[in-house]
Amino acid sequence: MSVKHISSAILGVGVDDTTIDLFESQYPVPTGVSYNSYVIRDEKTTILDTVDHRATEEWLANLTEALDGRKPEYLIVSHMEPDHGANIAKLAALYPEMKVVGNAKTFLYMDQFFGPEAVAKDRRVTVKDGESLNLGSHTLTFVFAPMVHWPEVMVSYESSEKVLFSADGFGRFGAVAKFDEKADWASEARRYYLNIVGKYGPQVQALLKKAAALDIKTICPLHGPVLTGDLGKYLNYYDMWSSYKPEEPEKILVASASIHGHTRSAAHILAEKLRAKGAKVVEMDLTRTDVSYAVTEAFRCGKTVLACATYDGFLFPPMEALLTHLKTKNFQNRTVGLMENGTWAPMAAKLMRAELDGMKNMTVCDAVVTIRSAVNAAAEAQMDALAEELVNK
């Protein structure tokens, strides 16, 4: 990704990483990810954030091109996570007169990552929530966004061009060069938000309230494309996701964790019964689908069926992983149906119910499907009852 002119004074110097397979060592990114960084060229030229260590050399080349002989006055640190902060010490060494701007927690974490000698005390500019920094014809106002999704996070609002530098907010998986402006921004933004930030809905709501007081024309996130045009659709998505409201209240996810295929087969039979009743259904085989996609679909749908085999008296691990992730991400306000399978001692429904009981505002259907080895007439009758209950909830 080469230097991108966002305006005559604001340039993007980020890097696309198309060789990474797992973001944060766990989330598949088949189209890569971008590490975004920005430069404001003014009387006091300013860099906003660095990039991951995987992208250092390309980023430095982009930065050199964007600076065009200028020496940066400031580095703004929005977020200390290593995919954005990895090159702080290197940049500070390259430009020994440059000052580093952050808040008290920023510098606490900076010392933990790099040691206090990386950025000397007299080079640190510690800002408070709402304070501003004049760069010449541009002014940055710092808006703290704690736990979106780390404690030190702050966003920066540039008032003359009405640009919000939003840290990880409004980020998206996928390399920017591969993003089609006509494509569905929400698909990988949704998966990014729900798996990275999803736990912190109240904190995102607090940030959205602060952002509502700002006149924003452009959003510059630390991952994904720069957002322009109708920003309302992006803000509406964030409001919905952070309020834990389903995008499609009547849509049903049928997620199965099957050892030898019988539970998956039963889940498909139930899905077909739901479709016959007019329901919109998506099926996911948890043994073949990364959990991040299942988490995303569970949040998107208003209703979910969890179909799981009993395994050594516990849940089959793919289902256990899904429930653990859902609980971690604050899954709530949904309707769930349960299906279990066990040849001699089916336990999955009881165990799944116990996990769901620890989540907020969950409605668990009264009808439960219990399969002993394979589907029979009794199990089909239970499926009919569960399907009827789900479509009428």
Regions found by a protein language model. Name each.
Residues 4-8, 101-153, 200-206:
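Metallo-beta-lactamase
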Residues 48-50, 72-80, 99-103, 164-168, ...:
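Active-site neighborhood of phospho(di)ester-bond hydrolases with catalytic His/Asp-centered motifs
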Residues 255-277:
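Short, charged N-terminal beta->alpha structural module
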Residues 54-101:
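Active-site metal-binding motif and surrounding structural segment of the metallo-beta-lactamase
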Residues 176-180, 184-219, 223-226, 269-284, ...:
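FMN-binding flavodoxin-like domain, especially the glycine-rich phosphate-binding loop
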